[in-house]
Amino acid sequence: MDDLVLARSLFGTTMGFHIIFATLGVGLPLMILVAELIYQKTKDDHYAIMAKRWTKAQAVLLGVAIPTGTIAGTQLALLWPGFMEVIGRVMSLPFQIEIYAFFVEALFMSIYVYAADRLSPAMRIVAVFFVLVGAAASAVLITNVHAFEGTPAGFKILNGKITDVDPWAAFFNPSFFITAGHVVLSAFMTGAFIVASVAAYKMIRTRKKERVYRFHRKALLLALTIGGIFSLLTALNGHESAQMLYEYQPEKLAGAEGLFETRSHAPLAIGGFTDPNEEKVKWAIEIPWALSFLAANRFDTVVKGLNAFPRDEWPPLFIHTLFNAMVGVGMLLILYSIIGVVWRKVLKKDRFPTWLLIIFMTAGPFSLIGIEFGWIFACTGRQPWVIYHLLKTSDVVTTTGSIGVLFLFFTFVYAVLGAAVVYVLLYYFRKHPVDEDLNTAES
């Protein structure tokens, strides 16, 4: 493999691993904050216990997110020196501000973990709130660099030189707010569904322990409710993202929908696989006129097809499958939430059948898969550009050798880290079962 493929594989693996912990690092604090708020309002000890236990998991995940994020930053400089030269001169603000966001998160996380029992109820909520603010701000700031890659602003390249630099224009690039909303909303969704998966699993294991079962049922319903809300909000934001693609990255939208010919009243292709030879999406379900309407809220909107662009600037055509998988996961998770809430609140069922709990157990893995598909779609769909229509990925890759060795090394490191996280979480929660916390709360 050439250096470009190896460099993209290495950095893609790093980001694919890091994004799991970064996403949960934003999503779990919201769950902790909501549990704290419910506890302070109702004085139901179950919610205080939820907040306490989820905080332990958050601490472990944060401990992995920090080094993997550092590795990702280092690899940016090592693998993409030409890209970082532009970022250093034009888009350094997010990295600088993110340092403060990280310190806010780390400071208040330490306060909440080590001094929660000595804080007043109001200060407990304040501490968790700033953990959430710091985590969300970090995610938004770093993801803003990705937004800048797709909708660059605040500089020009003339005769190979960077001129007319405006850091704030680069920071508030056209897709900043939409991208920021998408990353935060999807992180909240994922954090909730991970909790739902664990709660569903524990409900299956504790069917004969009524007190523990009720505790996990509350956690499940809370998680499904929050997950459902943010799944819906993520979907609405995704619609805005598609309209942004229509305006700023039309070939990416065409690739996502498998549209080859420019046309009005363009259909929306659901499912299927893009065939580059026949220039169509095979075995797809087409909804007439829907793509034109989704692109600009008019059925007669003209949507550019791939053939309107040079073939060497087409994104990989498999992004149609990634896009459909991402959307499909989101719709499935909304359905999960509706079923769970209806079963408990409308049908008034005290017990969930095992088959339904098994389905709910898949919510967390599906949400993470959706995050991964979305991230790969966002980055791969921008190719061959690293900065859209200004700088190609192949022009900024390092010429240093040994990338293959680094790829194998870091893959091994991530496997070890992943196994260590699973081991530590299982070890801690087996040593500290819910029964102990419930007994302490009742004594």
From Swiss-Prot:
The Swiss-Prot or TrEMBL record lists the needed cofactor(s) as:
heme b
The UniProt transmembrane annotation reads 19-39, 60-80, 93-113, 125-145, 176-196, 219-239, 322-342, 357-377, 405-425
Gene Ontology biological process: aerobic electron transport chain; sporulation resulting in formation of a cellular spore
User: EC number(s) on record?
Assistant: 1.10.3.-
InterPro entries membership: Cyt-d_ubiquinol_oxidase_su_1 (IPR002585)
Q: Does the entry feature the keyword Transport, yes or no? A: yes
**Observed phenotype of the null mutant:** Not essential.
- Under what name is this protein listed? Putative cytochrome bd menaquinol oxidase subunit I
Q: Which species is this record about?
A: Bacillus subtilis (strain 168)
